[in-house]
Amino acid sequence: GRSCLSARQERAAAILSQCEVERRGLEVGPYFRPVTDSSLHDVLYVDCCDEGELQRKFRENPKTAGEQLQPIDAVWAPGRPLSDCISHEPFYYAVASRVFEHVPNPLGWLQEIVNVLQPGSMIALVIPDHRRTIDYYRKPTTFAQVMGWSVEKPVRPTPSQVMEFLSESFEDDGAVDLNSGLPPFSELKRHYTDQDALGFAQFVEREKYYLDVHCTVW
């Protein structure tokens, strides 16, 4: 309704408050809730998935009921420089909401975006507090991990990242109130067992498969 729309507009205004939104911008991973509005902003939408994969995810996600999938303009294919995937034109800001935690090499990802922005541009990121998500029990990502990934340069979530996310996150079935304190992890419903997590970790290594997980915790 109107109140929901207003809340989204207020959220977008806060996120974009330091961006030159009257100039050309870039939004990474808009999915079904872009921060920018293509009817108001001159923006290029990019995602690591192509349109077909995004449509599949959209159909299978119960949280997308009543929503619309934002069409993308370019695919930032894993392992390819962003500059090779988009038009060579000046961009004056970039925005990504709830994308950063999915990135296997955070520092490298940021550098790729910096490389296509004009000097002095702004990057606006929305990163969820893990204490309000299914990552509640996970340890925050460390400086050493971020720097290590910047050296290793993984182009897809690593076996360790997959293993950690699947084995240390709980299933959000709507029954858990994150504001009232949580019981021990062992008492919560899990979507994956430790054996499942290990199996997926082995699978992504063997098949070089891109399994979308929360690679980092903030």
Stretch-by-stretch model annotation:
Residues 1-22:
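Class I SAM-dependent methyltransferase Rossmann-like catalytic core
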Residues 9-14, 27-31, 108-110:
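Short alpha-helical segments and helix-capping/turn motifs at coil-helix boundaries
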Residues 19-84:
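Class I SAM-dependent methyltransferase SAM/SAH-binding core
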Residues 20, 104, 118:
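Short conserved AdoMet
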Residues 33-37, 53, 103, 131-137:
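Short catalytic/ligand-binding loop motif for oxyanion handling, primarily in non-cytosolic enzymes
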Residues 64-78, 82-85, 108, 112-114, ...:
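S-adenosyl-L-methionine-dependent methyltransferase catalytic module, highlighting the catalytic core
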Residues 94-95:
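Hydrophobic beta-strand segment of the Class I
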Residues 98-102:
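A short His-aromatic
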